[in-house]
């Protein structure tokens, strides 16, 4: 500022302060650079003199933005200009079905920006800093079960949004049983929702833990016994049908009329043809 000219013995109003100092507030004019007496409108001019601007250091508000996390308490603090931020809080963020979150530090912007720490110096304005997060996609256990047959796996870990896979090998049919694949379901024994019709299941996109069930039915084979009278009279029941391992039960009888050479007595049922 330029010097101000005054007359001896006058009370003078000093020129408005034109000085600025970043991070400080002007306190007034003083007779010394530190300490001294504050000059007022009642100060009388008695000669050439130098007055000194004195300043007070400002404090500014540092505000914490959790940026999707749980808000911290207190949500801000006062930091003096030029001082370091000091201890900063560590926020948390709740997991969701897709991600877990780990705190990655405080930054000057919600996305990007520059990382700040306890040693960062406070500038000359109120400041907001933003929590950044590292997201980790969650994985879930997908289980597989079957009523009959074998599976290439019984469980696997699958990332959220991806699909699991499992292949069923059907059991072989044998004399006693016939096996039929009915599909993959969300509940045992064909319950819930059908999610697949082929032996290899590609699961729906994973959104949580789940178990899928291969539904294979097993039917006991049935066999028909046909009775051949082999020259005799046809019995009243020419055949019977029974399940595997089921007792045949009462068998029919038959007769054969005598001829000029022989008379015939029923000797039982055999699995090969016989004459005599």
Question: Which residues are covered by each model-predicted region?
Answer:
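Secondary-structure capping and domain/repeat boundary segments
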Residues: 1-276
